[in-house]
């Protein structure tokens, strides 16, 4: 469906996708290997989506940065920064060079998630 949309105009997808794509995207990858959100199948499907012509904007700009967007309310997870990066902005690959900023605002509280931000250049 996204590929079909992308044929007409570039696509931007934002949301809680409930998948930590790579080991860098969660605090404890070894102990979560078979848990929902980090199963091999989910991660493979996420890779398939990216390989279909889409870019994970945060990871594109910050390939080695360990930053999370969600923490369980249990076990003082946010206080311990034992989180997951499951909130994303994905863009069509043809928008990749227009990405100016992709951030996760861990300083903002009020939910078990924090806001994610994307700034793209306009095509003026």
Q: Where are these predicted regions, by residue range?
A:
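Short, basic, low-complexity termini and linkers enriched in Ser/Thr/Gly/Pro
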Residues: 121-124
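Low-complexity, intrinsically disordered Gly/Pro/Thr-rich segments
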Residues: 97-107
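Metal-dependent phosphoesterases centered on the DNase I-like endonuclease/exonuclease/phosphatase
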Residues: 1-82, 86
